[in-house]
Curated annotation (Swiss-Prot):
It is found in: Cell membrane. Keywords: Cell membrane, Membrane, Repeat, Transmembrane, Transmembrane helix, Transport. Belongs to the EamA transporter family. GO terms for cellular component: plasma membrane. This is Uncharacterized transporter YdeK. The keyword Cell membrane applies. It holds the Pfam family EamA. The lineage of its organism: Bacteria, Bacillati, Bacillota, Bacilli, Bacillales. Residues 16-139, 158-284 form the EamA domain. It comes from Bacillus subtilis (strain 168). It is a multi-pass membrane protein. The chain crosses the membrane at residues 4-24, 36-56, 66-86, 93-113, 122-142, 148-168, 179-199, 208-228, 237-259, 264-286. It comes from the Bacteria. PANTHER family: EAMA DOMAIN-CONTAINING PROTEIN (PTHR32322:SF2), INNER MEMBRANE TRANSPORTER (PTHR32322).
Length: 287
């Protein structure tokens, strides 16, 4: 397989892992405070990431990379987890998940601004069409819409797109898993003490589903998923592979339906087919 194909495969695996993030977060915030969930998942992942960096004896990033790593940390370690956790206090995960379809545009825009990519104009047409399909589906599907919850989700998309694009640019120099690992380690001096500060008064009231969800978002959403995702973006291009994010809402909706028993209508099938067509077309015109 060539480099581009490998990029799409790695990106797809990353999307599958990320698809479980919002359903897991929805379960977690039923028992955990959003602030504790955010800092604790980052602290757990940061400790593990630091261990990996030591075991594999990775060199420290150059000083010129520190600002970019802080941008990644702001976007994907702190901003996105916190904003989505806050949003899921106001809307269902099924409603929140469809906003993830707007991530490709945010990632592509920041890829142009920060990564120097220049996709063809037709790419933007299909990218916008796919995102509009997802946004339209979100409005039609409803599911407990809240203006505040929607605002949190939109803000999370912006900061996450920035973090994705910045991380993909860095991964070409530092390596894919090294980027998120260093971002987590840089966040650790803040996240670790805050996780103790926001620790629940009593753990007896915390259910097993919430604990398992905390483990999932800490290990998979914060670390393992990014290993595949950043590798995919670096190999296949930020704008091109980023379009796979359009599929994430529909994998997530399936999980929300199965795990959380949230209602998902049959209109999902038609929208999913249309979005996949947009992904295929955007891929063709990405470069």
């Amino acid at each position: 397989m060539n480099k581009t194909t490998n990029g799409w495969i790695n990106g797809f695996i990353g999307v599958l892992i990320f698809s479980g993030s919002l359903p897991a977060t929805r379960l977690a915030v039923s028992d955990f405070d959003p602030l504790f969930l955010t800092v604790c998942r980052a602290a757990i992942a940061g400790v593990l990431a630091g261990g990996l960096l030591l075991i594999f004896r990775q060199q420290h990033p150059a000083k010129r990379d520190l600002i970019s790593l802080l941008v990644v940390a702001f976007g994907v370690v702190i901003g996105f987890p916190l904003l989505t956790a806050l949003a899921l206090q106001h809307v269902t995960s099924a409603h929140a998940i469809v906003f993830i379809g707007l991530l490709p545009l945010a990632t592509a825009v920041f890829g142009v601004l920060r990564g120097g990519e220049r996709p063809r104009p037709v790419f933007w047409i299909f990218s916008a069409a796919g995102s509009l399909l997802v946004a339209g589906f979100a409005l039609i599907q409803g599911g407990g819409s809240s203006p505040l919850g929607d605002a949190y989700m939109l803000a999370s998309i912006v900061v996450c797109g920035l973090g994705y694009a910045e991380g993909a640019k860095l991964s070409r120099r530092l390596g894919n898993w090294q980027v998120i690992s260093w971002a987590l380690v840089l966040s650790l001096p803040l996240m670790l003490p805050l996780s103790f500060f926001f620790t629940p008064d009593s753990w007896s009231a915390i259910g097993v589903p919430a604990l398992l969800s905390l483990a999932y978002v800490s290990l998979f959403s914060m670390l393992i998923g990014f290993v595949f995702w950043y590798r995919g973006l670096a190999q296949g291009g930020i704008a091109a592979v980023g379009q796979l994010q359009l599929l994430q809402p529909f994998f997530g909706l399936l999980l929300a339906s199965v795990i959380l028993h949230e209602k998902v209508g049959w209109a999902l099938v038609a929208v999913n087919i249309a979005v996949i067509m947009c992904v295929a077309a955007a891929r063709r015109f990405a470069k």
